[in-house]
Amino acid sequence: MLNSYVVREVSNDKLKWEYEFAVDKKYFLDQLDSKLSEIAMNVKVPGFRVGKASIDLVRKEYLNEAMTSVVKKTIESTSSDFVKNSKFGEIISSNIDIVSYPSYYSDNDKEEDLVYKLSFEVMPEAPLMDIDNIVLSDIEVDIQECDVNEFIENLKKQRPDFVIVDDPEYVIQGSDKLVIDYQNKIKGKILRGGSAKDFVLVLGKGVALREFEDQLIGMKVGESKTFPLTFPNDYGMVHLAGKTTDMSVTVKSVYVMKGMRDSEAIAKDYGFKDVGHMEDFARKRIKQQFDQMVFTIVKKELFDYMDANYVIDVPECVVTQEIAKINKEIRDSGEDIQIDVEKEAIKRVKLGMLLIKMSRHNNITIKNEDVFSFIQSNYADYGVDIGNVLKMLQSNKNFANYISGKVLEEKVINYIIGLAKKDKKVMTAKDISLMFENI
């Protein structure tokens, strides 16, 4: 194959290359004749035994099929031979445009060869970050008495005192506690797990779907109602996700909020030995919450440092994919987010390349326990059924790739944070919250 083709560079723009290949006409036609002979040996032509039809007849019937096969094979072999010997690195996108075909029935050697253009984009080698030059904040939260009191007040709000409503004309409000019966159907069939009797629901707590609670507001004790209810696509119960059902509800009792209970009653209600143990629990939970905020803040510091101190040519095709992801994130959020999408996409791709380089250089890999821990902290702790997440992990390749990428990213970030120089700070919970909100 060494002398069967010649290559001419058409363009070279950073990571994007284009070459024109001219495959020698004689070489190509020899390959085509070989393919026709192969077909002739195996094809059954009406009036002939297998392999006994003349080559002229086979050529007449199967030339186009053979031409297509040989063109494909020739392009694959010549382009891969060239790329392999040229050592471009990792090619992440490519395209073939055929310019001309040789004529099988012409003896004129001056007629065109098989000519095609190969354009491709390569993934550049990212530099290895020098962790010794990185200085990150080491923030310790100063938990004050007001923070503990606020936490306990929130506990009280979760379990206020309620008193039953005796007035049959009372209209349900958005903070009432209800006892209801409900039943879910699709096309008249009761759904598994979609019905309950004497179900206790406190409105406004985010326990039920907002659309469901909205239908209950304005009803009265003893009233029944049937309405369509559409479950979100990411609903925890997979068999209901994305479906519209006929929901029937009967209100059996209504309770209105009377007031907040004192700290001793709340401590007992939550199972604490006394108020002191509840306050100790509050400090631990506050620290956990703010440790996660601090991690996000420090990660932002690290990303800003990486973005400011490393200049990399990023592949256009990867940036295009990232732009599509960001636009989808914005649409799914339902918020009016104003950002330079292309700039954000370029930054994400660059940071990803730097983190991948760091992971490969230091042999940082992910294990099953890393994935499970990530799912626990990012899904299960927020009420999502971990079993459903694990099923998606096995059945949805895109979701599995997303989780793997996030887990590896977090592991590399923790590795860098652990080795970077530290600027120790003690900050109040309020100040940390303000920093977190401004990210």
Curated annotation (Swiss-Prot):
Gene Ontology molecular function: peptidyl-prolyl cis-trans isomerase activity
EC assignment: 5.2.1.8
One GO BP: protein transport
Keywords: Cell cycle, Cell division, Chaperone, Cytoplasm, Isomerase, Rotamase
Start and end residues of each PPIase FKBP-type domain: 175-260
Family, per entry: Belongs to the FKBP-type PPIase family. Tig subfamily.
NCBIfam families given in the database record: tig
Free-text comment about domains: Consists of 3 domains; the N-terminus binds the ribosome, the middle domain has PPIase activity, while the C-terminus has intrinsic chaperone activity on its own.
Name recorded for this polypeptide: Trigger factor
